[in-house]
């Protein structure tokens, strides 16, 4: 559709992130059959060398952005795990779909691609997972992600909601929410392998 044409043009005429070959990395690393957990982000990081196709994740070449730092702090408080890498590929390979609602962004302009039609595609993915699978944990951090709750059948899935890990809201209920242990407890109750965070 038009959105696709525009997306291609955007990458030709403007600097965009993530690199073209990483736009669909979340769904490549976590195929449908393997999804156990879905963490929903808004759109990719918009500074150089940050976005790598997985929400909240960055490469180890750059410092962890504030939200990711706070996620790691909560992980340490929750499970005593100290993260040494900013790259969340290991989570993705264990069935954690790290899905941004909008998959691309123009450099240094947050949310600049929010009208490119990506959300129809990612909403469809969320709904397909909800409709066709069961006992998936959906993690909705912050008001934007929580708007996606309507796509999820709560009678057969588990939703974890809290404030967003960004510095602006982290003290409003993200710290202390213990999402990682809650996810693993649910997975174990359903006879699934827990995530090695």
Predicted regions: what is each one?
Residues 1-6:
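Short, small-residue-biased leader/transition segments that mark boundaries at the very start
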Residues 24-33, 129-131:
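A short acidic-Thr-Gly-centered motif at the start of a beta-strand
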Residues 23, 54-56, 88, 175, ...:
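Short clusters of hydrophobic/aromatic residues that line enzyme substrate/ligand-binding pockets
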Residues 33-35, 83-94, 99, 124-125:
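Flexible, compositionally biased loop and terminal segments
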Residues 29-83:
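Adenosine ribonucleotide-centric catalytic and binding domains
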Residues 7-25, 78-79:
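Short coil-to-helix leader/linker segments, especially the first N-terminal amphipathic alpha-helix
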Residues 94-197:
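Glycine/proline-rich loop-helix segments at beta-alpha junctions forming the active-site rim
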Residues 44-45, 90, 104-106:
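Short, catalytically relevant binding-site loops at active-site mouths
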């Amino acid at each position: 559709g038009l959105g696709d044409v525009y997306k291609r043009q955007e990458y030709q005429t403007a600097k965009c992130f993530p690199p073209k070959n990483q736009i669909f990395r979340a769904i490549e690393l976590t195929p449908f059959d393997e999804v156990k957990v879905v963490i929903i982000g808004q759109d990719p990081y918009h500074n150089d060398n940050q976005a790598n196709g997985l929400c909240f994740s960055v490469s180890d070449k750059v410092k962890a952005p504030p939200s990711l730092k706070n996620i790691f702090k909560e992980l340490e408080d929750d499970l005593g795990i100290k993260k040494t890498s900013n790259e969340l590929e290991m989570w993705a390979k264990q069935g954690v779909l790290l899905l941004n609602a909008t998959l691309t962004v123009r450099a240094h302009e947050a949310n600049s691609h929010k009208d490119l039609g990506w959300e129809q595609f990612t909403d469809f993915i969320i709904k397909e997972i909800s409709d066709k699978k069961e006992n998936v944990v959906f993690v909705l951090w912050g008001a934007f992600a929580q708007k996606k709750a309507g796509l999820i059948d709560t009678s057969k899935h588990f939703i974890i909601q809290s404030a967003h890990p960004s510095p602006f809201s982290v003290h409003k209920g993200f710290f202390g929410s213990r999402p990682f242990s809650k996810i693993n407890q649910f997975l174990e109750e359903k006879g699934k392998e827990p995530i090695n965070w």
